[in-house]
Amino acid sequence: MALLGRPGLGPLLAVLAALAASGTTTRPVHLLTLLSSGQGALDRVALGGLLNTLAARVHCADGPCGKCLSVDDALALGRPEQPGAPSGQVLEPRHIARLSAAAALYLSDPAGTCAEVRAGRWAARADQLLVLLESSQALSVALTRLLQQIQARAAGQPTSQQACVDLPQLLGEAAGIGAPGSPGPVLAALLGHVWSGACFHALPTPQYFVDFVFRQHSSENPNITLDELAALMERLGLGGATEPHDSHSDDSPLGKGQGPVPLAAPNSSASAWDTLCLSAQDIMAVYGMSEQAGVTPDDWARLSPALLQQQLSGACSPQPTLPTQDQLSQAERYLYGSLATLLICLCSLLGLLLLSCASCSTTSHYIIQAFLSMAVGALTGDALLHLMPKVLGLHTHDGEDHGFQPTWHLLAVLGGLYAFFLFERLFNLLLPLDPEDPKDGACSHGHSHGGHSHGVSLQLAPSDFRQPKQLHEGSRADLVAEESPELLSPEPRRRSPGLRLLPYVITLGDAVHNFADGLAVGAAFLSSWKTGLATSLAVFCHEVPHELGDFAALLHAGLSVRRALLLNVASALTAFIGLYVALAAGVGEDGETWILAVAAGLFLYVALCDMLPAMLNVRDRRPWLLFLLHNVGLLGGWTVLLLLSLYEDNIAF
């Protein structure tokens, strides 16, 4: 041990011991001492030996996992805030905890960790693991599962005679340097044992379950007394009232007719497995039983203490889910959801804002087109880049991470959509127009009175927003009378039954649509505030052109400005109903997934079936300006949702 005090010899001897693979277990004093004392460092030679040991320890089911870790990758763990800086020559003691967490990730999931290393996120994932293990309640359970994954990936299985390291030993070694329950020292102890070639036992021994039951009573008697047995049976819901025995004195609690003596709470420091919920496969593995042979009567007598311990500890009882950093409390969900929905509903008043400006008829047309393209980008981007990964479970934070690869694949879907959009738009711009196509209007539009179509209401001429002489009583006939000579006829305008029905069809369709939007916003805020923000942004972007178009369509149907605004606002308020239904129902994670899946389908339908055709069919005297606005809106919407999808884990207040 004196040689370890000399500079450079300690790491070198550790490397030689790892390469020798003698199979003997040595106490990992090197890493723990380095971490606790803050003296010394790991140089390139030591790190190279450690990485070779890690690569030799793992085994994948489909063959060798291969080597993906380099010394430079390990040295980069010391400067995660400067990924482009040149590598140093040593790893300082203050980075041992991150190195240990990063090594544990590699041992438990080598393929996934290699993907993180290539993406430059190895240090970030190691820090996330350390934060996850900070909770003392989650430390034992998470470390047990981590040891199970490491044991499953181990290249060789330990023999029955081999003494292996278990979780209590790791916790004890961390406590020995004055850091009980601290994840950094525990993982450093784990890495030290890996370096020395030790094996691991992830599950407790059979004797643990018997010891747990006897630890439940507080008396000094090594045996369970009658009173304690009665308390134990009552806790299990077994047996009837205990009759006092003749030999009992009147001072006995049972003799006085009092209830059984309550059991003492389990000592949390007695064992690291007290809160571990074991599966049937785990229990059979503890007792060395074959899954194919099953449990014999003799085996049942052996494993009964394990079942009793699981019942007494309550380890498998449903635990209240604690909100994560991204999740909101119930009051915050209602507050932020209501504010977001209110902003969305205010879109219904934008028509009045445009009508107040008599010179904005041409400008309003380009504003609508810009919002239209931004809505397509926001809707498709939110559906494909944000909602679909959540629905498919690709945005998980339970240790199994898929990296950015699915995001790039989904971005390629949007790339294909954009490529064909460019092809069609350039094809229409470069080819000569049909002489019958209108050239002097801002846009061509047709009308369908048999039903509600957003494509109809979104393709509007600038004259659709001309201000009437009397704002409080103006109608669509007043707005376009100066351009429609037939409306100047002394005969009153006769509206067809279909045109008279159109306002109610539009209002009903918008009410259902806004109700679905409210459901989507509510489910998004149930998931996290980031998902709520992204969904609210997408809904807002597509509601602006929708509400403007619907307002103009209502005016075209002959309604007054006041009545058109009233119907527009009334249909928008159904979004609050959908929001509160989603929040009050308190759907679980599965329910949120289904609602978000339906919301993704709704967004794709509205974007690709309603709004994109409106963009493709619009005609204008300045087509290249429209082409520029459409591209800016599309790319802007996709960029915002892409950045949110990639970096939402790094957003915090």
Swiss-Prot record:
Keywords: Cell membrane, Disease variant, Disulfide bond, Endosome, Glycoprotein, Ion transport, Membrane, Metal-binding, Signal, Transmembrane, Transmembrane helix, Transport, Ubl conjugation, Zinc, Zinc transport. Glycans are attached at residues 223, 267. It catalyses: Zn(2+)(in) = Zn(2+)(out). Residues 239-267, 472-493 are annotated as: Disordered. The record marks 517 as: Essential role in Zn(2+) sensing. Residues 243-253 have a biased composition (Basic and acidic residues). GO terms for molecular function: identical protein binding; metal ion binding; monoatomic cation:bicarbonate symporter activity; zinc ion sensor activity; zinc ion transmembrane transporter activity. A motif (Essential for SLC39A4 endocytosis) lies at residues 458-460. Its main location: membrane. Residues 1-26 form the signal peptide. It comes from the Eukaryota. Residues 356-366, 424-504, 560-563, 615-623 are cytoplasmic. It is a multi-pass membrane protein. PANTHER family: SOLUTE CARRIER FAMILY 39 (PTHR12191), ZINC TRANSPORTER ZIP4 (PTHR12191:SF21). The two metal binding sites M1 and M2 that are halfway through the membrane form a binuclear metal center. M1 is essential to Zn(2+) transport, while the other, M2 appears to have an auxiliary role presumably by acting as an additional transport site that can modulate the properties of the primary transport site. The binuclear metal center plays a key role in Zn(2+) sensing. Belongs to the ZIP transporter (TC 2.A.5) family. Homodimer; homodimerization is mediated by the transmembrane domain. It is linked to Defects in SLC39A4 are the cause of bovine hereditary zinc-deficiency (BHZD); also known as lethal trait A46, Adema disease, hereditary parakeratosis, and hereditary thymus hypoplasia. BHZD is a autosomal recessive disease caused by the inability to absorb sufficient zinc. The symptoms are diarrhea, immune system dysfunction, skin lesions and death if untreated. Oral zinc supplementation allows symptom free development of calves. This is Zinc transporter ZIP4. It comes from Bos taurus (Bovine). The gene is SLC39A4.
